[in-house]
A protein has these predicted regions:
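P-loop NTPase catalytic phosphate-binding loop
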Residues: 1-112, 119-121, 150, 160-161
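Conserved P-loop NTPase
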Residues: 105, 109-162
């Protein structure tokens, strides 16, 4: 997990890694995960060019669209669907197969999950949409607090080991 201050350098490193993996140079390296906590706070994504995207946004877009095939995965948390759509181009949701939502407006729920269920949820509940969209499978669960740094480090260590 990285914060907004380290975003630019990390995204540059991952874009370079993606290019190496696409060319076959780094194909055997282990999977890489980039956790973006609060994409709405990434100022570098706000000042868009004439096409509606910053240079950092273009690189993140490429990682989101092509990275999973080459073992580079994004975990993105955003406070609103609109903030996520500002950070990336329209259609970015197609790059995210697994989605989690707390209570949302009916429109955002339909756009994110393909169902209005998240608009009718109680507090302290969340929905998880699986990558198998055809099945329509959605799981309801109780989210809890973000784990402390020690727990996150243990999880990251396990992920690195494979």
């Amino acid at each position: 997990m990285i914060g907004a201050r380290a975003a630019g350098e990390m995204v540059n490193q991952l874009t370079a890694l993606l290019a190496r993996r696409i060319s076959g140079e780094a194909a055997s390296e282990p999977a890489t995960y980039l956790g973006i906590a609060g994409v709405q706070r990434w100022r570098e994504l706000r000042a868009a060019d004439a096409h509606g995207q910053t240079e950092l946004g273009k690189k993140l877009q490429q990682i989101a669209e092509e990275g999973a095939e080459f073992g580079i995965h994004l975990l993105v948390w955003s406070d609103t669907l609109a903030a996520l759509e500002r950070a990336f181009k329209r259609g970015i949701l197609n790059a995210f197969d697994l989605r989690v939502a707390l209570r949302l407006s009916e429109s955002d729920s339909n756009n994110l999950l393909g169902t209005p269920l998240a608009a009718r949820m109680d507090d302290n509940r969340a929905l998880f949409r699986h990558e198998d969209w055809e099945s329509g499978r959605i799981e309801k669960f109780k989210p809890y607090a973000i784990p402390d740094a020690e727990v996150l480090e243990a999880l990251l260590s396990r992920l690195r080991k494979g």
